[in-house]
Amino acid sequence: MTKAHILILTDLDGTLLDATTYSYEAATGALSAIQTLGATLILVSSKTRSEMEPLRLRLDNRHPFIVENGGALFIPMGYFPFPLEQAAPRGDYEVVEIGTPYVRLRTALKEIGRDLGCRLRGFGDLSLEEVSDLTGLSPAETLLATQREYDEPVVVESNGMAWNRLSAAAATRGLRWTRGGRFYHLMGGNDKGVASRRLIAWYERRAQQEGRALITVGIGDSPNDLPM
């Protein structure tokens, strides 16, 4: 009987990485076990592509990855032996964009704050020093974290602002909120689950071609990981 292939989709901060130090040292045993099993580890995060690429290099992870709460999938060129629906070439990747362009999110955030009379500060409103203070990232890491394309982390600075009012204001603009470990995130119709299911379908197709079963595992620690 052909051995089943194991596909593991993991969040980063607070899951694979320490929530405070961003180190994966505590996960080295698990990473070794994954390698021994021949399983595939997919990184799924609210982080930007610019943040995730250096981490992939350090982990020697050459598999597809999902950025900015499912805003886009980045698949190494030629990774799957068949054409990928809705994928466009970009450098070394085939990219499937699911999320809303960042410039539209920025415009909507300003409108929502004005309409609700509350102070909503996204990464685009904060200095690099402020983002660094809020996240604990180094200056170099902070610069990478602010290179957003599909998702805006937001600090809600109005006491007592009802979640349903924020949700409704986003929904009227075709957008939605989710909650991560540190921030609210304003985004489009994407989430980690939408992107993960798209990717899993391709792995299932490849597994069928190889005559293998596919076992999927999702790991996370925050509400934005639940769809995964």
Please give the residue ranges for each predicted region.
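Short, small/polar residue-rich loop motifs at catalytic or cofactor-binding pockets
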Residues: T2-H5, D60
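Asp-based phosphoryl-transfer active-site loop
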Residues: A4-T21, D221-N224
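Hydrophobic "anchor" residues on beta-strands that sit immediately upstream
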Residues: L7, P64, V217
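Active-site phosphate-binding/coordination module
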Residues: E25-G122
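Alpha-helical scaffolding segments of alpha/beta enzyme cores, especially the outer helices
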Residues: G29-S32, P54, R165, R198, ...
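Short, hydrophobic beta-strand segments that form beta-sheet elements in well-ordered domains
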Residues: L43, V217-G220
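Glycine-rich beta-strand-to-loop/alpha-helix junction loops that act as flexible
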Residues: N69-G70, I219-D221
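Conserved acidic, metal-coordinating active-site core of Asp-based
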Residues: I112-V217, N224
